[in-house]
Regions:
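An acidic-aromatic substrate-binding cleft motif
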Residues: 257-336
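N-terminal accessory beta-strand-rich subdomains and adjacent acidic, glycine-rich linkers
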Residues: 21-282, 631
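Carbohydrate-binding surface patches
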Residues: 571-609, 653-654
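C-terminal beta-strand-rich structural cap/linker in extracellular carbohydrate-active enzymes
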Residues: 633-657
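Bacterial Sec-dependent N-terminal signal peptides
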Residues: 1-21
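Aromatic- and carboxylate-enriched substrate-binding clefts and catalytic-loop regions
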Residues: 338-519
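Glycine-rich, aromatic-lined ligand/substrate-binding cores of catalytic
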Residues: 508-583
């Protein structure tokens, strides 16, 4: 017996010296993280409810002064319980109170240089990041990170819901990559991406397990002046690894690597896990591990805006047409109008000043469009060469503040390099000094920015509403996209889809070109299913005239800021239902479908139990009609809070008091 105990002690000692292993659990014990340094290669595994959802996956990075991917040894481990409490106004949940386990590991490489890895483990979320610590003699004081071995290795049967990255300086006016490629649902791990250069965040995975599914969402957060990363192509037995920007982005200018001071941390890589899609839709991990980077004295207002360009295009950016859309905003009680590209030539600064005064007389404020650059791509629309230059940028921001302009939309970034991510931060910081909120388009995914920057509204970072106008193909895809984004793009950040489209045809006259294929209630429901604190309602003057009164009245009070949410039902790219509570306490439930046949859904709505509600729904098409038939009725909800609804193909349902 004594010999056996001695052998076990010796084995334990050997394991500690050559293959240290550390485990940590989520507060509810369902997530189980294990980190090892076996063979000098740090790896982690992740189990959820006893199922290995991420197989052994590599950790580590390579810097100019040291290799932290091999010859590594864990020399110190600390674990503590943490509680994250904060309030926000521009995301899916206004108050967050999150408990988690924090595991901090200190490793050294074969030269004795230190690397810290911090894991944040909540009930359905894991986040981790690296911190390069000072070396013993405090030199070097700065470093370049060339890449990471950080990987995500899934079971072989896993299915994917991802959108590919594309080669740089491609597409219209060499503006790509701009995070505007098509998602492919339920693909196999071994399927190659369309362009062969990996995938942009966020990335959704489904692990089938004896008739049940485990869902995993991978993304990153806390990126400010660091490159935006992505997932590589899949490698059998190894999985996906973190990839840095492509060298050709920004017309080849700037490094694809990360330049940092020491000590310094990378962004957090986030993993959300659940046996249903509820944790995916409701996660707050992008905000839980970041902090505000500056405060503000400005009172930034949420709201709704009208936008002529989405249906009337470039030629509408003139003084008279913009007045018409100001009038629409005023009629509907909306706070803003977006004056889009080419205003510098087609309206002029004096014209903008006159428009600002006219809008002010109607209780409406302007938002102005800007090109982000003049050197990174060939997008011709102006104003150009302003937002990329600090002197010109501040000059225009001071002018806008004087006019009462409340926000800017900055477009055509086309890259993830460190200098581009720094430009986002610089624009936001300067805009805050002049009381301006900011929307970014043609650009990367926001990574925790709603909490980091108090004047940030949203990014596009997906195929958005303009494509519904451009081609009939994308018009037919609209329902698919908008039932997919709640589980992917909008799950990790506010999303400027860019327009609740009420025109029946994608044209100024509302009679020509291809039709809209979704129902009116579907479009209205996207104000609930999509989350963005300043939301576009793409009403045109002629579409407004033809709206039924019940639609018009609902659109007048469409909410944009939320206190809470509850996932109700859905499957990515097929259907989605959610309930959201406004900051004033009023609940709205909405369901949309991309299915080819009507679907029956039983919604659990305890907030409406025993109450009379209004149910807005798209009904079947009438004989000879191209469009679903919208309607509204009052209905009493039973004490059990259950409501059975029929959702038409490309149709929607809304429930509110």
């Amino acid at each position: 017996m004594k010999k056996l105990l001695l052998s076990l002690w010796a084995l334990s000692l050997t394991t500690f010296v050559f293959a240290a292993e550390h485990t940590a659990f989520s507060p509810d014990k369902r997530l189980h993280l294990t980190v090892r340094d076996d063979g000098g290669q740090p790896t982690y595994t992740l189990n959820y409810n006893g199922l290995e959802v991420i197989k052994p996956s590599k950790l580590g990075l390579k810097a100019d002064y040291g290799d932290f991917t091999q010859g590594m040894k864990i020399v110190e481990a600390t674990e503590k319980a943490v509680q994250t409490v904060y309030d926000m106004t521009r995301t899916k949940r206004a108050h967050v109170d999150q408990k988690a386990t924090m595991l901090t590991l200190k490793l050294v490489n074969d030269k004795g240089y230190p690397l810290q890895i911090t894991f944040y483990i909540a009930n359905n979320d894991v986040a981790y990041r690296y911190t390069l610590l000072p070396v013993k003699d405090e030199n070097p004081r700065c470093a370049v990170i060339y890449g990471e071995t950080s990987s995500f290795n899934f079971p072989d049967e896993t299915r994917t819901f991802m959108t590919p990255q594309i080669q740089p300086m491609s597409g219209w006016q060499r503006t790509k990559p701009s995070y505007e490629e098509e998602f492919v649902p339920d693909a196999r791990l071994t399927d190659k991406s369309k362009y062969g250069v990996g995938y942009t965040f966020p990335c959704l995975f489904r692990i089938p397990n004896k008739g049940n599914n485990t869902w995993i969402l991978i993304s990153e957060t806390g990126t400010s002046s660091y490159p935006g990363c992505r997932l590589s192509e899949y490698e059998p037995t190894k999985g996906y690894h973190i990839a840095y920007p492509q060298a050709g982005e920004n017309n080849g200018f700037g490094s694809e690597f990360a330049s940092i001071p020491l000590p310094s941390s990378t962004p957090w890589r986030t993993i959300t896990v659940g046996n249903s899609l509820q944790p995916i839709v409701e996660t707050t991990i992008p905000y839980d591990v970041v902090e505000p980077l500056y405060t503000t004295q400005n009172d930034y207002k949420p709201g709704r805006y009208t936008w002529s360009w989405i249906l009337w295009m470039d030629e509408s950016c003139n003084y008279e047409d913009q007045k018409k859309f100001i009038d629409v905003a005023a009629t509907m009680g909306y706070e803003y109008i977006l004056v889009d590209a080419l205003w510098d030539k087609q309206i002029g600064r004096k014209g903008i000043e006159a428009l600002a005064n006219y809008a002010k007389s109607k209780g409406v404020s302007l938002m102005l469009w800007y090109n982000s650059n003049g050197t990174e791509n060939d997008a011709p629309q102006g104003p150009r060469n302003i937002m990329s230059n600090s002197i010109a940028r501040k000059r225009d921001m001071a002018w806008m503040k004087q006019l009462g302009v409340k926000a800017i939309k900055v477009d055509f970034f086309g890259g993830d390099k460190q200098e581009t991510l720094q430009l986002f931060q610089d624009i936001l910081s300067d805009a805050n000094e002049y009381g301006l909120q900011v929307i970014f388009h043609g650009c990367t995914l926001p990574r925790g920015w709603e909490r980091m920057y108090p004047n940030f509204i949203a990014n596009e970072a997906a195929l958005a509403s303009e494509n519904v106008y451009f081609t009939e193909y994308f018009a037919r895809q609209e329902a698919f996209q908008l039932t997919l984004y709640p589980f992917t793009r909008n799950a990790v950040a506010a999303f400027d889809w860019g327009g609740i489209l009420m025109n029946h045809h994608m044209s100024k006259d509302n009679k020509s070109r291809h039709q809209r294929f979704t129902g009116d209630i579907f479009e209205m429901a996207t104000a609930i299913t999509n989350q963005c604190s300043v939301n576009c309602v793409a009403l045109t003057p002629n579409a407004l005239e033809g709206l039924p009164d019940f639609e018009k009245e609902w659109l007048k009070q469409v909410p944009t800021t939320w206190k809470d949410l509850r996932f109700l039902a859905g499957y990515p790219g097929k259907h989605f239902a959610v309930a959201r509570q406004t900051t004033e306490g009023k609940w709205y439930a909405a369901a949309i479908s991309a299915e080819e046949q009507p679907i029956s859904m039983t919604l659990h709505l305890p907030m409406f139990a025993g109450k009379e509600v209004k149910v807005y729904a798209d009904g079947p098409k009438k004989a000879g009609s191209l469009w679903l038939t919208p309607g509204m009725k009052r209905q009493k909800i039973g004490k059990n809070g259950l409501l059975k609804v029929i959702v038409q193909p490309r149709g929607g349902v809304i429930v509110n008091e």
